[in-house]
């Protein structure tokens, strides 16, 4: 985070285009266009700036699909952003990014999350400090090994041009980040996660972020197309709602992006669009031994080398 030469306008243009491309692809797949909610912060609010939320609820394929773009600025980095960088505490900041969470209707079709972002910390009389972050991760209710391999291979292909050491590094980071400590289980089968990234300078770091963003549809759409029409019943929907409870727990307790948004006075509707439309909890529930539900825990909710 030492190179202070950057181009926010190019990053903004890319992110807005990425949101549109993904929203158009999801709307075409579902048969229902995503609604558009453009928003702007008021002059008396803690944050300045605005954004655009693309949202689909009650669709044929997606029970909820939300893709948010935001570009906001504030007077002081929130604790979730400066905890690992105490030297930046109290600096002004600009944060822009695209974040999405898709909750399919069919329990055999996995939930997915993707985010790409840039942050700039500023202080009068000192050079700005920028960094990139992002990644994508897959959260199946019923695990399929070919889906996991495809998702991870696509992530690896997106990173390999920037160094073959990055995929294993970002995969491990993802496995460690998306972990529910109080449950002692991973949120899903992982993917890639990175933060505080500016080592190669602006151009190369921006290229990497674009490669991750551009890989998302290739990583996820083939899985949806394979699984969205599989038959299912009440048992599968009940287990889906139970597993979605874990998603809620992670997002509200651990997720850095959710905490950043809430701590900085972000737009609550956009921050919480990642929540599943239906979730439930059961006291001390255990899957039936040998069942497909049990196999999720034994074979998929543990870190594995998928490629």
From Swiss-Prot:
Assigned EC number = 1.3.3.3
Report one GO cellular component: cytoplasm
Gene Ontology MF terms in the entry? coproporphyrinogen oxidase activity; metal ion binding; protein homodimerization activity
EC class name: oxidoreductase
**Entry keyword Oxidoreductase:** yes
Q: Which reaction does it catalyse?
A: coproporphyrinogen III + O2 + 2 H(+) = protoporphyrinogen IX + 2 CO2 + 2 H2O
Pfam families from the xrefs?
Coprogen_oxidas
- Mostly located where? cytoplasm
UniProt: substrate binding residues: 99, 115-117, 265-267
Q: Which PROSITE patterns does the protein's record reference?
A: COPROGEN_OXIDASE
The site feature described as Important for dimerization is recorded at: 182
Q: What is this protein called?
A: Oxygen-dependent coproporphyrinogen-III oxidase
């Amino acid at each position: 985070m030492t190179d202070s030469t950057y181009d926010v306008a190019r990053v903004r243009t890319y992110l807005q285009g990425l949101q549109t491309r993904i929203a158009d692809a999801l709307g075409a797949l579902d048969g229902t266009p995503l609604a558009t909610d453009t928003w702007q912060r008021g002059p008396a609010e803690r944050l300045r700036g605005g954004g655009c939320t693309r949202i689909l609820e009650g669709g044929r394929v997606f029970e909820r699909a939300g893709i948010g773009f935001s570009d906001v600025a504030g007077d002081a980095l929130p604790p979730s952003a400066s905890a690992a960088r105490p030297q930046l505490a109290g600096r002004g900041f600009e944060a822009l990014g695209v974040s999405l969470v898709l909750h399919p209707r069919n329990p055999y079709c996995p939930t997915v999350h993707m985010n790409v972002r840039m942050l700039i910390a500023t202080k009068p009389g000192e050079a700005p400090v920028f960094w990139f972050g992002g990644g994508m991760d897959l959260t199946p209710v019923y695990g399929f090994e070919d889906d996991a391999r495809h998702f991870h291979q696509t992530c690896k292909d997106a990173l390999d041009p920037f160094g073959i050491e990055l995929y294993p590094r970002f995969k491990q980071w993802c496995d460690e980040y998306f972990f529910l400590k109080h449950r002692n289980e991973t949120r899903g089968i992982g993917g890639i996660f990175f933060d505080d990234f500016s080592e190669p300078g602006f151009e190369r770091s921006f290229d990497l972020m674009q490669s991750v963003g551009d890989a998302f549809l290739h990583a996820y759409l083939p899985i949806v197309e394979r699984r969205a029409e599989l038959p299912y019943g009440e048992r599968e929907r009940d287990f889906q709602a139970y597993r979605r409870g874990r998603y809620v727990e992670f997002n509200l307790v651990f997720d850095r992006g959710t905490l950043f948004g809430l701590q900085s006075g972000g737009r609550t509707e956009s921050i919480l669009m990642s929540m599943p439309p239906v979730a439930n909890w059961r006291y001390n529930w255990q899957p039936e031994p040998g069942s497909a539900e049990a196999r999720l825990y034994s074979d998929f909710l543990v870190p594995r080398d998928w490629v």
